[in-house]
Amino acid sequence: MIYDYGYDVIVVGGGHAGVEAASASARIGAKTLLLTHNIDTIGQMSCNPAIGGIGKGHLVKEIDAMGGVMAKAIDMAGIQFRILNSRKGPAVRATRAQADRLLYKKAINSLINNQENLDIFQDSVDDLVVENNTVCGAITKTGITFRAKKVVLTVGTFLGGKIHIGKVSNAGGRAGDQPSNALAARLRSLPFRVDRLKTGTPPRIDRRSVDFSVMEVQHGDNPTPYFSFFSKGKIEHPRQIPCYITYTNNETHKIITDNLDKSAMYSGLIEGIGPRYCPSIEDKVVRFADKERHQIFVEPEGLNSIELYPNGLSTSLPFEVQCNYIRSIKGFEKAFIMRPGYAIEYDFFDPRDLKPTLETKHIKNLYFAGQINGTTGYEEAGAQGLVASINAAISIDSDKSWYPTRADSYIGVLIDDLITKGTKEPYRMFTSRAEYRLILREDNADLRLSNKACELGLLSKEDQQHFISKKNAIIENIAMMKNTWIGPQTQKARDLEKFLDKKMTRESTLFDLLKRPEIDYSKLQQISELNLNLQDDAVIEQIEISAKYSGYIERQNKDIEKTATFEQKAIPTDFNYSQVKGLSNEVLQKLTEQKPTTLGEASRIPGITPAAISLLTIYMKKTGFIK
């Protein structure tokens, strides 16, 4: 049966990538269908009940700046908020929020259920309609064909998913859900490179069986921060509660090492590579054998939930071993496990087979986003879903495209890393992956991206107005401060000197004075003659950062300008690299396989030398591809 409602975009999968994808194309105005195997699991947090963290928080802020739903949802559902690295510079500060799982899912559903241009249908997808190497729709398990101009696959860990607990394995996309084996087989029949990855989750513990009195208490920040640029004054956080910290010990490690042969990871049952930066407890004990203990964050799953998430204890050991090592940990001596931990192995597709828009190079109008591309984490998935669906929507009746770059966002860093380098292990975002960290801060994500969001129609009118007002206030106040002078031996100077190490000897602007480490905006406000009445903390923060880091920011902007021309030099998709004399066989093979879209992208492919890029540039200039 063909169910033709004239859809522009079909999104397959209702996880974090799928939700952002479906919401984005619908906001742009594309008629969108979200296909999910179970409507009740839309927006479900399959693993840890948290959003954000180092690098990840930056992605959430950028998704929010583009009108996405993740930040607003966690503001509605967060039960503990913290700014990580708060004592360090603004480039590496990151927001992290503990979530109430049920409230988060409720918030996500509230946001997408009220989204115009979006339909939701429950059925798993078994096949794609592909004609002349172009996707035209999807076929469900019950035999319904949905036709559309674009298809975005956001299928998470469901492709050929296999769950492992010790030496017991069973098919599953996650605990309690069937895998998408038919769709996995269909995708394997297409000309994509495919491999296996592994991730895992810890056992869940009944909080009533835990002794919190012997653990360290970890409170959230006060005042409680917001994740979304648009939430303050509109969304009220739920009640805030603490998390706790405990540690493994020598007994824990002995139990684990004595039973390594029973672990699915170490017995050879699992072929896929696990996440380097979120290893199982077995991996930690083996790889860091010199460590006497490992930190465990004991995280509540919700305000009214009795389940705890022991972050740091992901495992594929048998259930009885899980019980033993859990009860060896301080505070967990009488712990009751409500759900066993497990590892899950699944198919992923080499992201080097994608364009920067996340459209596949081999099948036109088909986009991949999320764990199918080898990433790990809700935030990385959401970011990809956003970009994939933006491009699906804006290219329906034209050849338009938009994708972020390494110079304007962490989303750009994420996508560029994936499509140029690929990945052999689940990819996680860190601030260290970005060259321009001082410019790509959490606090200015809206200033970097919301102009484009307005242009694409991704922001609501209310959010657009909020952004424009904030941006104008920053511009106007910085201009005013650059044009307001204080001379020495004036009353203003005398009032100011109580904050300075030494007396003023020359005339300075307020902006230059703000560059001094001992001066901040609040001190300038104490000089009544200046009439500085600004009360918006977000605007003040941008003014202070612009002043105090002006030299570094200017330097990074110059670096970006130097590389911008190079980045924008497009390489035709049908470019014949064999015509370029002097390229080695290795370089020729890599360029031909990956088909980079720009010279900048080509330069970041592992094994492509500066000399090869020079030869390519010279040839492209000589033949008229570059002017």
Swiss-Prot record:
Q: Where does NAD(+) bind?
A: 274-288
Q: List the disulfide bonds.
A: none
As one GO molecular function, the record gives: flavin adenine dinucleotide binding
Does the record bear Cell cycle in its keywords?
A: no
List, alphabetically, the SUPFAM superfamilies matched: FAD/NAD(P)-binding domain
Q: Which UniProt keywords apply?
A: Cytoplasm, FAD, Flavoprotein, NAD, tRNA processing
The parts of the chain that form a coiled coil are: none
Q: Where does FAD bind?
A: 13-18, 125, 180, 371
User: Principal place where this protein is found?
Assistant: cytoplasm
Q: Which GO cellular component terms, listed alphabetically, does the Swiss-Prot or TrEMBL entry include? A: cytosol
Tell me which Pfam families the record gives: GIDA (PF01134), GIDA_C_1st (PF21680), SAM_GIDA_C (PF13932)
GO process annotations (BP) = tRNA methylation; tRNA wobble uridine modification
Matching entries from InterPro entries are given as: FAD/NAD-bd_sf, GIDA_C_N, MnmG, MnmG-rel, MnmG-rel_CS, MnmG_C, MnmG_C_subdom, MnmG_C_subdom_sf
Question: What is the annotated localization of this protein?
Answer: Cytoplasm
Cofactor dependence is on: FAD
Function description: NAD-binding protein involved in the addition of a carboxymethylaminomethyl (cmnm) group at the wobble position (U34) of certain tRNAs, forming tRNA-cmnm(5)s(2)U34.
Name the family.
Belongs to the MnmG family.
| Summary of subunit composition and partner proteins | Homodimer. Heterotetramer of two MnmE and two MnmG subunits.
Which PANTHER family does the protein's record reference?
GLUCOSE INHIBITED DIVISION PROTEIN A, PROTEIN MTO1 HOMOLOG, MITOCHONDRIAL
- Listed name of the protein: tRNA uridine 5-carboxymethylaminomethyl modification enzyme MnmG
User: Where does this protein come from, organism-wise?
Assistant: Francisella tularensis subsp. tularensis (strain SCHU S4 / Schu 4)
